[in-house]
């Protein structure tokens, strides 16, 4: 019995082993078949495309900021100056008092071999005496004076005295200067360098960053602008000036603002001939339009900027623009219902107000307006309008008109007064509106 049982068990084991062997053999054959099929497929593909794998090179380009900007740093010696001013600040609420005395400092840069300097208007505001220092001459004082200033644009043009020019030429051979670049080609993420003398420090400092974008007429950069840096140049990687450092935000990090150099180039010829250059004004006030308003007026869709006020004797008033008109184009640039347009020099739309900043006095402008469904084409010249009765005054460059009667000061109301009085005279706030000032 035992032998029979053993034979049965042994037989069963042989059957299991045989079945397993057959299964294993089948698996091996299938694997070989798959491998042969894969190899044949690869051979077919290789025959079709003649594929020959080659080793690929890994290209790595690492340039540090120091390497990028070192050639620029070598070109800027003595082109960036530190500006000092003796300030006499007038109190317009008490103009009869002796002006408050003080000193301030800022930065600037030479723009030609004649010793002309660009800086911010606020750097030289109410300055009674001005002088500069440059790196190679240490603390030696070089006298400068104001040729022209545009306070609303925050730009001033200075010039070395003849004696100071000779000092620099004797020591350095010539007056070094920076080339003016093209701010219209700037785009977000472009690298820039801001130069100046922050916090009144004696040594030239540089900070690097990128173009963050444009905000109104300003270039916003990630390089911080500190007090004392104002008026210094903003350079591109080629060493060209693309902006004038102007403002920083104390409660923000890595935020600075610069004036596009192309705006400076537009007004530069006028600064040589006009001491106080005011910002031109088209002479209209506009509101956002709507599709419903456009249809109601019978004007084509999409609409343009809706004119709600026209200032008397302004450029567009003389050209025939009227209240209720809809402005569709200016110099071939199409306006939307918000008064904004696409221009070649900006990635984002710019407002009509910012566009006007790029117009120069005497420049011809063409307009397309619609009035109750009828198209009108207007061609006129951009002119400096007469100042409205209530305007801002600049004591450094124009006289202050006042009289004192029995301890009472009588003088024309100005924007300066409105800013100084603020909440103490709420009834005067309406005169901040341009239309109210002109009436």
What spans do the regions from the language model cover?
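Catalytic-histidine neighborhood of serine endopeptidases
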Residues: 112-155, 160-165, 172, 183
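Short conserved beta-strand and strand-loop elements enriched in small hydrophobics
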Residues: 83, 129-136, 192-196, 363-371
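A conserved glycine-rich beta-strand in the N-terminal activation segment of trypsin-fold
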Residues: 61-71, 90-116, 140-143, 177-179, ...
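Flexible, gly/ser-rich surface segments that form the specificity/activation loops bordering the active-site cleft
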Residues: 123, 167-170, 176-216, 249-256, ...
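C-terminal recognition in membrane/secretory proteostasis and scaffolding
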Residues: 1-48, 121, 145, 159, ...
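Conserved hydrophobic positions within beta-strands
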Residues: 108-110, 144-146, 211, 234, ...
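N-terminal activation segment of mature serine protease catalytic domains
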Residues: 31-104, 116, 120-121, 129, ...
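Catalytic nucleophile loop of clan PA
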Residues: 109, 224-244, 316-319
